[in-house]
Amino acid sequence: MLNVNELVKTELHCHLDGSLSLGVIRQLAQMAKITIPAEDEALRKLVSVHGKVDSLMAYLKLFDFVRPLLQTATALELAAYDLVRQVASDKVIYIEVRFAPELSTDQDLTILEAVSAVLVGLNRGQEDFGVVAKLLVCGLKQTNTNQTKELFFYHLSSPSRYLTKNILSSIVKI
């Protein structure tokens, strides 16, 4: 009988801010000096969908809890690294991670710094766990188009292939 858990997998649509483990949420909350529930079940209810969600906006509201946790380069690097660790344990060998860097600029981190931090975490995860991890940078249609353009043109002209080699094709505006 085929055991799906033993098969290697690819993950083609994974959002960084929706993929934090409870352990990393706890670390990030401590780093950000944010109080969170002590019990895992109570914390899980704040960051997970339970049952039917009535609207997209109700679903997206879950991300409001996570956003303040991803406002530093250290936090973003840790989140990206932990995501690769998590999927490696599920036998994922390739992952495309979606990330909207402008959501991590509330504390003066720039978009380029946010992307760089995520790439550092993904690259460390690749090296440590053997998972090919690519970043799909998303621009949000309700925010400043100039920020997305800046990142796009930086990606096209960057002399640093280390920074941009793992960004997939173009920047996506969602």
Where are the predicted features?
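Metal-cofactor-binding active-site regions of metalloenzymes
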Residues: 1-174
